[in-house]
């Protein structure tokens, strides 16, 4: 009578298979890790772009200057003192008007009221929405822009011009800076 042969795996064969699977899993994980990191960075960038556009839209929705008219800036403020017309705000006076501060955003009536605003994210009504944008920060700078023969330079002008540059920088939780800018005309 012939002896039955036993079937199955030996302990050594099982250890070899486990080792090969571990090596394969390590290689696959190492190949996929950079992609997951890039994916997270893209999510932060998209969120920053969304926030930057919203902040810029909020600022651009205001009048050119506190001395401009309420109907689309008509009558517009003037660069040089003229009888019967309001002069635009001096470059040194850009920023909060009287009775305005960082906590009274609903009182902002012109773009330069946002000048120097920094910190966590607040909506149009001044409510804190930093829960939706955790660890995101906003920096806003408004200045008169130099106009070199119809070409906007993006540079700060020392005198009043017909153009204000609104510069918004969004800083994401990783510290990456996302700049946004627009020019508002005095028309």
Locate predicted features.
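Aliphatic-rich helix starts adjacent to a transmembrane/signal segment
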Residues: 5, 9-53
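Low-complexity, Gly/Pro-rich coil/beta segments used as flexible assembly/activation regions
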Residues: 46-50, 56-187
């Amino acid at each position: 009578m012939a002896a039955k042969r036993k079937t199955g795996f030996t302990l050594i064969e099982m250890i070899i298979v486990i080792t090969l699977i571990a090596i394969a899993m390590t290689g696959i994980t190492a190949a996929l890790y950079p992609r997951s990191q890039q994916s997270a960075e893209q999510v932060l960038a998209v969120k920053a772009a969304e926030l930057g556009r919203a902040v810029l839209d909020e600022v651009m929705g205001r009048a050119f200057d506190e001395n401009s008219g309420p109907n689309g800036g008509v009558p517009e403020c003037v660069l040089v003192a003229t009888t019967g017309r309001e002069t635009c705000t001096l470059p040194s006076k850009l920023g909060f008007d009287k009775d305005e501060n960082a906590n009274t955003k609903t009182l902002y009536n012109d773009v330069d009221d946002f000048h120097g605003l920094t910190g966590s994210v607040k909506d149009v009504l001044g409510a804190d929405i930093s829960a939706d944008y955790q660890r995101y920060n906003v920096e806003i700078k408004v200045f008169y822009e130099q106009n070199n023969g119809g070409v906007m330079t993006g540079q700060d002008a020392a005198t009043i011009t017909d153009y204000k540059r609104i510069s918004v920088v969004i800083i994401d939780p990783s510290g990456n800076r996302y700049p946004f800018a627009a020019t508002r005309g005095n028309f």
